Amino acid sequence: MSKLIHARYTENGDSGWNGKAQAGDQTGNEVSVTEFYIAPWDFALRYYNWELAKEFVIIAKKLAGCVKVGYDQSQRNDLYKELKAYNFDVDKFILLGKKVETDCSVFIYACLCVLLPNLRSDKNAPTTDDMENFYKNKGFTVLKSGGYLNGKKNITGNIIVRAGHHTAIFQSDVDSVAKYPTEVDSALTIIAQAVLKGTFGNMPERKDKIYRAVQDKVNSLVM
């Protein structure tokens, strides 16, 4: 069964704005791994580097299994701040860090910041309303077809989002990530063979034709 890794709710089953939530995971369910479920997801985000996507999942599962990370929207940026204090060393934070809170979108953002320094910022982290615009120019592809919303086409490391509501990290029950590079290699081989055959010609527009062919292949792989 495919899984979701996500920050879900406080120990009181709410968002935390009433000030009653305590730092850290009080129940083991505030930030946790659950079975994948169908919801009105709006889109998925997929990072272009699949080795990094797998590392992203490993980091998320470490933090989800750590009692130091709980849920509270009113203290949503605290996980990011504490990871920054330990130079984004997750193991050191788990060993030495203080108990903190996060929410669904900052949990994902903080995990990604461990691996992608270019994302790091002390500003308020992106919310589910901001995630599409925030990530789409940072190496992520936005995927909106039905297969990504019901889980059938998602692969490990995809991020699924319901804007204004919730977001989670997808972990497949099959090793889809290992298959994807084979599809990419096959597509590149087809284009390379076309170049060698002179399919794109030798005129100045040759570069544009090759670019369009590559883009068409990319689109076919992610749709």
Please report, for each region that a protein language model flagged, where it lies by residue.
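N-terminal capping segments
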Residues: M1-R120, A163-H166, Q171-D173, A178-K179
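Solvent-exposed, polar/charged alpha-helical surfaces in well-ordered, non-transmembrane soluble domains
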Residues: I58, S105-A110, T189-Q193, D208, ...
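Short, basic/aromatic beta-hairpin or loop at an interaction surface
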Residues: P117-V142
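Short alpha-helix capping/helix-loop boundary micro-motifs
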Residues: F140-K152
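Loop/turn positions that initiate beta-strands
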Residues: I155-N158
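Acidic, gly/pro-rich intrinsically disordered regions characteristic
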Residues: A178-S186
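Extracytoplasmic Gram-positive cell-surface binding/anchoring modules and repeats
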Residues: D185-L188, L196-K207, Y211
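Repeat-associated, polar segments at repeat-unit boundaries in modular proteins
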Residues: Y211-M223
